[in-house]
Curated annotation (Swiss-Prot):
Residues 61-116 are annotated as: J-like domain required for holdase chaperone activity. This is Protein CHAPERONE-LIKE PROTEIN OF POR1, chloroplastic. Pfam families: CPP1-like. One of its GO terms (cellular component) is plastid thylakoid membrane. Its main location: plastid. Keywords: Chaperone, Chloroplast, Membrane, Plastid, Thylakoid, Transit peptide, Transmembrane, Transmembrane helix.
Length: 252
């Protein structure tokens, strides 16, 4: 009886061992992909990488409201708002494009307004000239505005003459420099008016006007503001250079 029970227990344990071993082999032979496979990442199912911040005012039509600024904002405030928003949403392509588009619209509107302001200013000045008295119109007909290059060249010439006179103030008077400046003034006016007599008359008038203003204003300057070697003649010549420059540059 005991022998029979021992044999049954031996057979059952052997059978159970075979079952466990077969299950272990089946688990080892199972494809590795079943164990490597896990839940998909949610970031791959969402556009633009999932957690990238998006600009909340992408669809706002007004460019000022889109950038979060007022219509009276300065150019520095516009640039600052644009840079701040781009630093926050540069990873989101649509947000960055929306911010840049609003910024470009504001710049274009500012350029158009400036252009209109310049045109309106010219129109107003022209209208005021037309509405002015006849003697004012006749006076303005003798005035013109040359290109900036011509203004700078003549300013350099007469500025050089003034510096030359100041540097030689201890040796001799500025008569030679004034004569050269007067000749240059007549030359420029003759090239403009094509009339030597008219050019000489305007140049002489500019010379007299500069001398008169210098003789009248120089004595009013406090002596402690002037260099000891600067004479009345030298200071008067500086006014003459200014008058000759204005005459040959803006008169016709």
């Amino acid at each position: 009886m005991a022998t029979t029970l021992i044999s049954k227990l031996t057979l059952s344990s052997a059978f159970l061992g075979q079952q466990f071993s077969s299950r272990g082999n089946s688990m080892r032979s199972a494809p590795a992909g079943l164990f490597l496979r896990g839940p998909r990442c949610a970031a791959t199912d969402t556009p633009y990488g999932g957690n990238i911040p998006q600009f909340p005012r992408v669809n706002v039509w007004d460019p000022y409201k889109r950038l979060g600024i007022s219509r009276d904002a300065s150019e520095e405030e516009v640039w600052s708002s644009r840079n701040f928003l781009l630093n926050q949403y540069y990873n989101h392509e649509r947000s960055a494009e929306s911010i840049e588009a609003a910024f470009e619209k504001i710049l274009m509107a500012s350029f158009i307004n400036r252009k209109k302001t310049k045109i309106n200013l010219k129109t107003r000045l022209k209208k005021k000239v037309e509405e002015s008295p006849p003697w004012v119109q006749n006076l303005l007909s003798f005035v013109e505005l040359p290109p900036p290059v011509i203004i700078l060249r003549r300013l350099f010439l007469f500025g050089f003459m003034a510096c030359w006179s100041v540097m030689n103030s201890t040796e001799a008077g500025p008569a030679f420099q004034v004569a050269i400046s007067f000749g240059a003034c007549v030359y420029f006016l003759n090239d403009k008016t094509k009339s030597l007599g008219r050019a000489a008359l305007i140049g002489f008038g500019a010379l007299v006007a500069g001398w008169f203003c210098g003789s009248l204003l120089v004595p009013m300057i406090p002596p402690n503001l002037l260099h000891p070697t600067w004479s009345l003649e030298l200071l008067t010549s500086l006014f003459i250079y200014v008058s000759l420059f204005l005459g040959c540059t803006f008169l016709k």
